[in-house]
Amino acid sequence: MLSAWLRVIRVRFLLSSVIAVSVGLTINWWQTNQIDFLHALLTFGGVLVLHASVDLLNDYWDYKRGIDLQTQRTKLSGGTGVLPEGLLKPSQVYKAGVLFLVIGSLIGSYFIIIDGVIIAILLVFAVLSIYFYSTKIVDLGLAEFFVAVKGTVIVLGTYFIQSSQITTHSIMGGIAVGVLSSLVLFITSFPDHDADKAKGRRTLVIILGKKKATNVYWVFPIICYTMIGVGVAFDIFPTFCLIVFLTLPILIKCGKNLRHSFDDLTKLLPIMNSTLLYSRLTGLLFMLGFIFSGVYKLQQ
């Protein structure tokens, strides 16, 4: 039973939210040498249950719409398989998704009391977009955009809770982190193209077609690297953040291979895995850039 719940929550994908919160925290620490650890823990808790909520509700609606009955499941695409295999009841997954949404909202409500209207706006956006993600947002072709905004909002919210400010640092840092998560969603939608299209979903891969979509693969990391490169050039981010460019070889290999393997699941699987690795490593290196710089400043 526990293993089924861990599968349906997609624990391995929660790392994207951990990285987003960590980036928000480390930007603030780099600037102030301070972290409110209680608020940091509550932020981690709130963001993770909200992330779990969207994955649970997505699995529920994909099953109800019959999408997950047609996909060829892999570790990164095609749904979790928990509902088609009968490991959990649809009602259980739906109720758990709503429960996690409520818990996340309660944690967010605490920060509304402490920090005011900015957190209220971010929380309302999060709750509405999470609940309607699988039934409205994806069908409108906005899934990748939503995930990018979600990552940005997590960094913004985390930074604001710590500093009571929204700054260029948190906005640009949030965009860099958000598009990395979008890249993972984008690449994992290739194998689901036919099943998603048949059931009315509109991912970027469906809108553009698989072949044209291979060129769009580069857009996400270009935005990420541009945010960080410009940030360093204008002293918004520390020079140490340039270590993110160490992941370029992984990206280039994935992008080149995708052009010839987008319709072959066997060849696409390692590209998907490497893209996930690229996204996580780049996010972690970005976070470490602030930590290295903060430690360096303390030693001066």
Regions found by a protein language model. Name each.
Residues 32-57, 120-121, 125-131, 169-187:
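Membrane-embedded alpha-helical segments that form the functional core of polytopic membrane enzymes
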Residues 1-38, 42, 46, 138-145:
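Topogenic membrane-insertion module of multi-pass membrane proteins
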Residues 49-74, 183-205:
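Acidic (Asp/Glu-rich) catalytic motifs at the cytosolic membrane interface
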Residues 18-24, 146-160, 177, 206-210, ...:
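Small-residue-rich segments of transmembrane alpha-helices in multi-pass membrane proteins
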Residues 79-168:
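Intramembrane alpha-helical segments
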Residues 233-298:
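Extended hydrophobic alpha-helices typical of membrane-associated regions
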Residues 71-112, 205-237, 277-280:
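Multi-pass membrane catalytic core of lipid/isoprenoid biosynthesis enzymes
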Residues 25-45, 105-120, 155-175, 227-240, ...:
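Helix-coil boundary and interhelical linker segments in multi-pass alpha-helical membrane proteins
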